[in-house]
């Protein structure tokens, strides 16, 4: 066993590992009492995610509690926007609000190139502190929102159920949208490189809303910009594993595997065995336990983890949920998830 490289990083690189590493999307958050207590004292989400002391403390909360194999930066996919000249706020229970939605060519042309070391130095500070704190016990993960999802937020101005405004732009003014997406792709690639230089060992790109696109529109408005981000980052950091996650990805799974990422994160609506058949052998998988299962019994959680891990055997696999952990999830069930992931080899023997 290689003691000097974290398990998750070895797995993401495709090295032989003793078990799949385990972490959870949104593992730092509202389901944890320590987070809710901190939130009561610091009610502004932007303060919690942009104050380096708070972001560091929150990022470390699940590591202190559960010792996952990955520690992800506590931040938000919209955090880079002010550095490009787009102001936003996150309102509890309502989500993000963009003060001045991007709807015109002038607004796109007025956007600033992102210089993360100037506008987001707090991110670099937190990542460096996380690396120092967890050492080789866990891999430090960075993340970004993909261009389509960022565009969906800034064009709509808020979360949306049907994405009518950005789809109207896509089908009426496609060149305008392409300019916006290209700006985001270049800025996000720059931001990811900054995260890697600051200490992130694995990075994940969330294209949360790309699952709202038809396959042909995914090919035009999402995939090329995912690929551009991957290519720009890999030019500078060829050895840093990259993960792509899309919520509701069943219709575009094969396309995700062609973007150049190292790992595709599956949501829980795709059976792990089926998902593997639909992806190239060289592409690893992450996932894909239904987060709703964590409201169930410990035995149900263990049984599903065994099922997922057995189906992924022989491929590079990172055990995770198929979406972020849900608010209200019992903390003890999160503990069961992590412990079952770490003891999965024994659980598989018992189940055979």
UniProtKB/Swiss-Prot annotation:
Catalyzes the decarboxylation of four acetate groups of uroporphyrinogen-III to yield coproporphyrinogen-III. It comes from the Bacteria. CDD domains: URO-D. GO terms for cellular component: cytoplasm. Its EC number is 4.1.1.37. It is found in: Cytoplasm. The record marks 76 as: Transition state stabilizer. Pfam families: URO-D (PF01208). The keyword Transferase does not apply. It catalyses: uroporphyrinogen III + 4 H(+) = coproporphyrinogen III + 4 CO2. One of its GO terms (biological process) is protoporphyrinogen IX biosynthetic process. Homodimer. It is an enzyme of class 4 (lyase). Coiled coil: none annotated. This is Uroporphyrinogen decarboxylase. Pathway: Porphyrin-containing compound metabolism; protoporphyrin-IX biosynthesis; coproporphyrinogen-III from 5-aminolevulinate: step 4/4. InterPro entries: UROD/MetE-like_sf, Uroporphyrinogen_deCO2ase_HemE, Uroporphyrinogen_deCOase. GO terms for molecular function: uroporphyrinogen decarboxylase activity. The keyword DNA damage does not apply. Belongs to the uroporphyrinogen decarboxylase family. Keywords: Cytoplasm, Decarboxylase, Lyase, Porphyrin biosynthesis. Substrate binds at residues 26-30, 76, 153, 208, 323.
